[in-house]
Amino acid sequence: MIDVAHELGVPSYVFFTGNAAFFGFMLYLPTRHDQVGIEFRETDPESAIPSYVNPLPPGALPSLALNKEGGYISFVNHGRKIPPIYTVGRMIDLKGKTHSGDNQAKQEIMKWLDDQPPSSVVFLCFGSRGSFVEPQLKETALGLERSGHRFLWSVRLPSRDDGLAKPTDAENLEEILPPGFLERTRGIGMICGWAPQVEVLAHKAIGWFVSHCGWNSILESLWHGVPIATWPLYAEQQTNAFQMVRDLGLAVELKINYRLGSGALVIAEEIEKAVKCLMEGDSEVRKRVKEMSEKSREAVIEGGSSYASLGRLIEAMMANVTVPARK
């Protein structure tokens, strides 16, 4: 489409919805192909990727304004013959989307959260395509139960019809979870299928978010000041998790596996230990995430970095508009 627009003399812009570090990684791939080759599967997982080198001084909090990550944008722009980059984030829907059939589920979830103490609930949700097989669900359930902490857990099952189809809600939870689990955790936990993620993250009862690290989920969590425990599943989620944990210090690692094709279970003991650590520790990450929440909100108001970038984009668009002459 860009080629067509160019032939017609119409200005065109690419809307990239991921983060700047991953964008820099993709720009680096041609160089890597020329120097190293295309193999990634057997590559040392600690291989240096230029866009994931944090150029800021040690201990400095990155001025991350959602889709504007300071040093990452500097890398992307440095010495490269590419058009200007307009960092206009946040690009998230703070109202969320609720289909008519989900209203009852949403009301039940929010009512349950209203009854919980502040910052007492760990929220587990893995996006519209995140799902787990039954053995992993059982391990997760046991880990949550043994932790003794409150939880809200969105359980989705892989589609049986098509590998590309979205996961489905479980019809009978008792068949896929440990015997007696639902009864034993009735007082401290709630299991749902679909969950209104934006509204849940905004609720005062949520203390931590166990996430697949889709970029939208990261943005929503940072916006609401909820720290993340990473459990990436597919696509660029591994690199998102790496960036949040190792590069920015804005999340903690529940699971990151940098080798492709790893289907190893996260066992109950690991989950129990992780949840206890999250909920019982005085986390420096939580403090940093709260600060980032404030910075991200400042970025989108008048005078903020994203607000200014959007203004520059509009100016560039208007400068390139050609008004046809009247006949």
Q: Can you annotate each of these PLM segments?
A:
Residues 1-204, 208, 213, 222-224, ...:
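Nucleotide-sugar-dependent glycosyltransferase catalytic domains
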